[in-house]
Design a protein with these regions (language model features):
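A short alpha-helical cap/connector motif
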Residues: 1-120, 124-196
Length: 196
């Protein structure tokens, strides 16, 4: 119910994706049921600080901060949505880094953030990109690192799936639920959560 006001990836989004090979829509580009699962995880593990890497238009961070009112909320993004004609809308409390996460400037910014309970990595979906974001963020104080698109169901997300499958250290949780909003009885996205 808490997620009800927010549009997630639905049949319209899927049609855009199939037509243009990209989901260019101002919404949360995730499976609603999996976001609900993420919210359950956040509640169960008392997540009070959140960093999202790769935010599109900011829908997920708006929804999560709106529900959980994190003590610390931060985002890192290169602003791709703006180049596609969309506004990026973030809560006032958000600390934002605009630029590539593989830079000394990002590392300095991330270090200043300090401990983050949950880092959601949803930026570069290529294998080397997601691995790089994992390795960078693993260096800084955190409890959990999460990844979107672990199923690798389309050619744009196979790098995430490969990385997730190879990640054989620490503890892993998977949130993979049927994507009902597009009429599927299985997950084509998936959220993976990892801890040391």
């Amino acid at each position: 119910a808490k997620l009800a006001p927010y549009k997630c990836w639905d049949r319209h989004t899927q049609a855009l994706f199939e037509e243009h090979n990209e989901a260019k829509e101002d919404c949360i580009l995730q499976n609603r049921e999996e976001v609900i699962g993420l919210m359950e995880f956040i509640e169960k593990h008392n997540i009070r600080s959140y960093l999202e890497i790769g935010i599109w238009t900011g829908g997920l961070v708006r929804a999560l901060h709106g529900v959980f009112d994190f003590d610390t909320v931060a985002t890192a993004d290169q602003g791709y949505a703006k180049t596609q004609g969309f506004e990026i809308t973030l809560p006032a409390a958000v600390q934002s880094y605009w630029g590539d996460s593989d830079t000394p400037e990002f590392r300095a910014w991330r270090e200043k953030l300090g401990h983050i309970d949950l880092v959601m990595i949803d930026g570069d979906h290529r294998y080397h990109g997601v691995k790089r974001d994992f390795e960078i963020n693993r260096e800084y104080p955190h409890r959990f690192l999460a990844f979107h698109d672990i199923t690798g169901a389309n050619r744009w997300t196979t790098g995430v799936a490969k990385f997730w499958d190879e990640l054989n250290v620490g503890h892993k949780w998977e949130i993979c639920r049927p994507h009902a909003e597009i009429g599927l009885d299985h997950s084509v996205m998936g959220i993976g959560i990892w801890s040391e």
